[in-house]
Amino acid sequence: MARFSILDLCPDLVEKAMNVQNGLVSMQSTLQLQAQKDINDPCTSIDSTTDIMSNPANDNSDYLLDESVDDERSESTSSKDSKSPCSNSSDDKKPSSPNDKPPFSYNALIMMAIKNSPEKRLTLAGIYDYILTNYPFYRDNKQGWQNSIRHNLSLNKCFVKVPRNFDDPGKGNYWMLDATCEDEVFIGGATGKLRRRPSTLSRARMDAYKQYGAAAANLFPYFNPGLPPMPRTPFITTPPTAFLPRPMMPMPSLAPVFTQPELIQMYLNQQQGLFAKLQ
C-alpha cells in the first residue's frame, strides 16, 4: 500500500499554515520588545504600565497643611504641563525668568508677605503690594489670584484677622500669623506649600515619657498595662429578696414534628376519608 502525506495532497494549504504560524511568532516577539521599551521609556504613561511596574509612594514625616484655593484654572493646568518629564531638552535648559509664575502656593505667598513685614502684620492691600513687588508675574496676570488670596486668608487657620486700633488711620483689618503656626509651619522646598512640624510640646511630652515612663510604671503598678486587673469586692454579697427573680413558668408544649413519610401517610388517609364520604 502506497504511503502519502498531507503535504503531497495540499501543498498550498500547508504553506499558508506555516506562514501564519511564523507571523504569530514574529508578532509576539515584537510586542515583548515594545513592552520592554515602554517600561524603560520615562515618557510612557503610568496607566499603560501599571500591570508591569508600580512606584512606591513617598513617605514624608511632615504634615501637609496647605490646601490652597486656586481660582486660576488655566494657569495651574499650564504649570502642571510644563513640569512633564517628557518635555524637550531645550525647554529644560531654558533659564527661569523673573516673569515666570513662582513655585509657591497662595498660602505660602501670604506667609512670606506677613513674615517679611516690619510689624509681622499686613492688610490685604499690603499683601497684594508685596506679591506684586516681588513677583512680576502677577502684574500682568491679575485675573483670579487676588480672589484666591482673599479666600485663603479666610479658610486657613494659620492666618488671624486683627482689628485695627481706633487711633490707627487707614482702612481694612490686619492679618497676622497664628502663634501656633509661626514656629511650626514652614514652606516646603520641593512643593512650595505649607507644611507643619511636630509641635514642641508634643516632642517634650514624648521625651519625658521615654525618660520617666518606666519609673512611673514601677511606682504606680495599678497603671501598668502589663499587670492583670485587681479583683473588686462587691458591696452587696447577696441580692435583696425583693429583687429575686420570679420562678420560671412552664413553657407550652410545642407542636409535634412529623417526618415526611408520616405526613404523606396522613395526607393519603385524609383523601381516603373524603372519598368515602362522597360515596
UniProtKB/Swiss-Prot annotation:
Disruption phenotype: RNAi-mediated knockdown by injection into adults causes almost half of their progeny to terminally arrest at the larval L1 stage and the rest developed into fertile adults. Simultaneous knockdown of forkhead gene pes-1 causes 8% embryonic lethality and 80% of progeny to arrest at larval L1 stage. Its main location: nucleus. Gene3D superfamilies: Winged helix-like DNA-binding domain superfamily/Winged helix DNA-binding domain (1.10.10.10). Residues 64-73 have a biased composition (Acidic residues). InterPro entries: Fork_head_dom (IPR001766), FOXG1 (IPR047208), TF_fork_head_CS_1 (IPR018122), TF_fork_head_CS_2 (IPR030456), WH-like_DNA-bd_sf (IPR036388), WH_DNA-bd_sf (IPR036390). Residues 101-196 bind DNA. Residues 42-61 have a biased composition (Polar residues). Keywords: DNA-binding, Nucleus. Residues 42-102 are annotated as: Disordered. One of its GO terms (cellular component) is nucleus. It is found in: Nucleus. One of its GO terms (molecular function) is DNA-binding transcription factor activity, RNA polymerase II-specific. Disulfide bonds: none annotated. Residues 74-83 have a biased composition (Basic and acidic residues). Transcription factor. Plays a role in embryogenesis and later development, perhaps acting redundantly with forkhead protein pes-1. The keyword DNA-binding applies. One of its GO terms (biological process) is embryo development ending in birth or egg hatching. The keyword DNA-binding applies. It comes from the Eukaryota. Pfam families: Forkhead. This is Forkhead box protein fkh-2.
